């Protein structure tokens, strides 16, 4: 009887939830490798390949102060998939689906309303802010997933006062810390859930359980001490964080500029703009009934956002991705509004949000250059040296040359030493040991000596470099242009890149003659 009652109450929710899940997966999976490899993606995927090949280097990311969980997962199947970029990005696709399920769980746990939960899922599924990064081989999507589930089991721990819930919350927090350092916010925000405790004496039972969460999470994190360079995590964290002392001299810098980035540059475009109205509806709807739940949501969203905006040296959309799940739950809770006129306005802005989001997503799926990305995102992922346009094509050409010349070694010099090049080329040539890829530096005025020596030794020798990094006429260096690959045109004519390097970056592929 209980199962029949449960099915009757939940059958439409299960069906709708399943359809939303399938829809979210399909739109994330479609054309997954359309966007060229990004600098950090190339690094993470290359690390995974090296870690797979050499067991003694399983802690390789620590050399750059990065936690390795994403790479540990990727290394197990990186060689089983023909396209390494697809292998890396599919992890984020599944992480996004894990976040989606977690959003449903958290929203229902807080509001006990099926419509709020389904709407929260829909918003995550289509919002460009989440959709874009769920299709990138970056660690942020995975960290966001662990953050949602840490919050879910943290709330359950507070409500049930059960040790097993605290242990699971600790495991989720620990996985987050093994993914990326900002996961520390997941632990710092858990005491906010204590607002759900209705009897002060119950805190005596709850607080020790959160000590358990901390011990389990940091116990997992300390696994990293088994590898060399554990100290590099703290060292590299300092590169991204401003000292606390500066708040006394510059309290609004960079807080105000970063808030302008979020609310003036990012949200109107990638939100997209109806997000502002939905946030206001969510804040006002049924406040008296759900004020505790909404305090948890608002602090979980704004707390990390304010701290990152105040103390972050680097500040981009993906650095605040983990704050979006609770924000989307808040937006969905606007459906709880009672006033009919206000509810009609909520539905109007909801439909506008759905329409504008789907148009944005369509461009990302078919022609990312047409998507109305903020300048910082467009520049990094589409326009500048960090965008890997042409790299896969260069790799395919080199593979064909290897087949034509099986007895000859092929040496390829690329600009840089770390990042889009040479890592972006190495990930595609991992199974071609006769093709040697080496970084030769930046801003070249002459052919590097290592490439000249390779040519003298009888090897087929090539150079891959972005146009802005080649500071001399290629004809004077004896370079024969094989192919060139245009990146997306620079839209901001006032940017330093446009002024110094022209309207478009180009990847150049040369052979030494």
Name the predicted role of every residue range.
Residues 38-39, 92, 129-143, 316:
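Short acidic/glycine- and proline-prone juxtamembrane loop motifs at membrane-interface regions
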Residues 86, 90-111, 149, 153, ...:
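Transmembrane-helix motifs of polytopic, lipid-linked glycan transferases
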Residues 3, 108-114, 150-166, 176, ...:
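Membrane-interface transmembrane helices that cradle and orient dolichyl/undecaprenyl
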Residues 44, 49-50, 175, 186-293, ...:
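Transmembrane-lumen/periplasm boundary regions of multi-pass, lipid-linked membrane glycan transferases
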Residues 21-24, 120-125, 173, 177, ...:
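Short helix- or helix-capping micro-motifs
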Residues 351-400, 416-424, 500-504:
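Membrane-proximal, lumen/periplasm-facing interface regions of secretory-pathway glyco-
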Residues 433-513:
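Aromatic/acidic, Gly/Pro-rich catalytic loop(s) in extracytoplasmic/lumenal soluble domains
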């Amino acid at each position: 009887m209980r199962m029949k009652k449960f099915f009757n109450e939940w059958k439409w929710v299960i069906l709708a939830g399943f359809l939303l899940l399938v829809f979210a997966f399909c739109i994330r999976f479609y054309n997954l490798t359309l966007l060229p490899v990004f600098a950090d993606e190339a690094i993470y995927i290359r690390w995974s390949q090296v870690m797979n090949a050499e067991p003694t280097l399983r802690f390789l990311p620590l050399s750059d102060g990065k936690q390795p969980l994403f790479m540990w997962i990727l290394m197990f199947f990186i060689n089983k998939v023909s396209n390494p970029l697809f292998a890396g990005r599919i992890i984020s696709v599944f992480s996004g689906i894990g976040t989606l399920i977690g959003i449903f769980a958290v929203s229902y746990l807080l509001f006990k309303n099926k419509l709020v939960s389904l709407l929260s899922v829909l918003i995550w599924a289509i919002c460009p802010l989440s959709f874009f990064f769920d299709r990138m081989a970056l660690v942020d999507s995975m960290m966001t997933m662990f953050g949602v589930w840490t919050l879910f089991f943290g709330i359950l721990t507070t409500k049930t006062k059960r040790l097993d819930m605290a242990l699971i919350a600790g495991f989720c927090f620990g996985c987050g810390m093994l993914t990326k350092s900002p996961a520390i916010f997941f632990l710092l925000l858990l005491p906010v859930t204590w607002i759900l405790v209705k009897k002060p004496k119950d805190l005596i039972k709850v607080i020790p359980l959160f000590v358990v969460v901390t011990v389990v999470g940091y116990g997992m994190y300390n696994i990293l001490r088994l590898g060399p360079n554990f100290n590099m995590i703290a060292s590299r964290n300092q590169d991204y964080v401003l000292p606390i002392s500066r708040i006394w001299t510059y309290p609004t810098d960079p807080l105000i500029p970063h808030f302008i980035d979020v609310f003036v540059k990012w949200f109107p475009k990638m939100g997209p703009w109806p997000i502002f109205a939905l946030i206001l509806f969510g804040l006002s709807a049924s406040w008296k009934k759900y004020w505790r739940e909404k305090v948890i949501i608002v602090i979980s969203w704004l707390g990390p956002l304010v701290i990152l905006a105040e103390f972050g040296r680097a500040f981009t959309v993906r650095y605040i991705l983990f704050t979006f799940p609770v924000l989307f739950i808040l937006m969905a809770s606007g459906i709880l509004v009672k006033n009919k006129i206000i509810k009609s306005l909520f539905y109007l802005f909801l439909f506008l949000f759905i329409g504008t989001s789907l148009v944005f997503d369509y461009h990302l799926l078919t022609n990312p250059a047409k998507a109305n990305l903020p300048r910082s995102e467009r520049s990094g992922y589409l326009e500048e040296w960090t965008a890997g346009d042409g790299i896969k094509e260069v790799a395919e050409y080199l593979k064909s040359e290897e087949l034509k010349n099986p007895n000859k070694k092929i040496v390829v010099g690329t600009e840089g030493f770390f990042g889009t090049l040479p890592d972006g080329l190495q990930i595609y040539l991992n199974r071609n040991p006769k093709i040697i890829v080496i970084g030769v530096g930046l801003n070249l005025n002459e052919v590097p000596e290592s490439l000249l020596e390779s040519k003298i030794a009888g090897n087929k020798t090539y150079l891959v470099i972005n146009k802005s990094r080649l500071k001399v006429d290629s004809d004077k260096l004896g370079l024969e242009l094989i192919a060139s690959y245009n990146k997306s045109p620079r839209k901001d004519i006032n940017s330093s890149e446009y002024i110094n390097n022209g309207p478009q970056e180009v990847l150049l592929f040369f052979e030494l003659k």
